[in-house]
Swiss-Prot record:
Gene that encodes it: atpH
Gene Ontology MF terms in the entry: proton-transporting ATP synthase activity, rotational mechanism
Main localization (coarse): membrane
Keyword set, alphabetical order: ATP synthesis, Cell membrane, CF(1), Hydrogen ion transport, Ion transport, Membrane, Transport
Name used for this protein in its record: ATP synthase subunit delta
Family of this protein: Belongs to the ATPase delta chain family.
GO cellular component, one term: proton-transporting ATP synthase complex
Record NCBIfam families: ATP_synt_delta, PRK13430.1
Localization annotation: Cell membrane
Source organism phylogeny: Bacteria, Bacillati, Actinomycetota, Actinomycetes, Mycobacteriales
Length: 273
């Protein structure tokens, strides 16, 4: 996103968080409903280029853009969702595409807030990461989900069958909205959502690859050690790669710590060459 759009999104996100907080006992339901409706609105905008351009037209006044959004969506979405749309339309976005992307981000955040209200945010974070790893290891399924020639509804139906009864409702809703509405690809988008869930908990993510599965005690000890190193709370996203032979490879942001046996052997070979 360009600077103007980032600033607009930050302001609307703050307004969304405040509105959900003020909903109090209805916050969970309001957040879930708002998230779902924002994705519905994005579907409408994706299918109507003229409308998508008009609601983010910087040549129009803020009130004109807000009035257009109200005229189109009033009575079709809840008052809470309409308020998010009107607030978004009043902002100046760099281009219509980034306005649309901003609504996607807001919808995702609303669903994550609903998980937070249910005490499920950590579980959703883990489920999203696990799903991204499953898709990474199932290239045939991922190819089907990434196929632009296949109808989005059919792809969502396919993924829904895979997820049915295995994840929380929020995880399923977030995963399904990624399909057919990708900003990059399904694996990267779902992994990014898991990191966003971690960030809402005040955690940074350490991606850990080990030769064997780490148990809960080992994960906790590793998280504590990394927290001392980096000075912030950490979420451990771990996966297994037997080819490492032993040890760990840890990635935090752009920094990589390679303590694997295979890595040590490779460095030894390089030194002997």
């Amino acid at each position: 996103m360009h600077a103007a759009s980032r600033e607009a999104l930050a302001r609307v996100t703050s307004d969304l968080d405040k509105a959900l907080w003020e909903a109090k006992e209805n916050a969970i339901a309001t957040a879930a409903h708002t998230g779902a409706e924002l994705f519905d609105v994005v579907e409408v905008l994706d299918g109507d280029r003229a409308l998508r351009v008009a609601v983010a037209d910087s040549a129009k006044s803020a009130e004109d853009r807000a009035g257009l959004v109200s005229a189109v969506f009033a009575g079709k979405v809840s008052p809470a969702t309409l308020e998010v749309l009107v607030t978004s339309a009043r902002e100046l976005w760099s281009n219509p595409r980034e306005f649309r992307d901003g609504l996607v981000t807001l919808g995702r955040r609303a669903l994550l807030r609903s998980a937070e209200g249910q005490g499920q945010l950590g579980q959703v974070e883990d489920e999203l990461f696990r799903l991204s790893r499953i898709l990474d290891k199932e290239p045939e399924l991922t190819l089907l989900l990434d196929d632009r020639s296949t109808d989005g509804a059919k792809k969502r139906e396919l993924l829904a069958k895979v997820l049915y009864g295995k994840v929380t409702a929020v995880t399923e809703a977030l995963a399904l909205q990624v399909i057919g509405r990708r900003e990059s690809n399904a694996i990267d988008d779902i992994d990014a959502l898991s990191k966003e869930a971690a960030a809402l908990q005040g955690h940074s993510v350490a991606h850990v690859v080990s030769a064997g599965r780490l148990n809960d005690e080992q994960n906790q000890a590793l998280a504590q050690k990394l927290e001392r190193i980096y000075g912030r709370a950490m979420s451990i996203h771990s996966e297994v790669d037997p080819s490492l032979l032993g040890g760990l490879v840890i990635r935090v942001g752009d920094e990589v710590i390679d303590g694997s046996t295979s890595g040590k052997l490779e460095r030894l070979r390089a030194n002997l060459a």
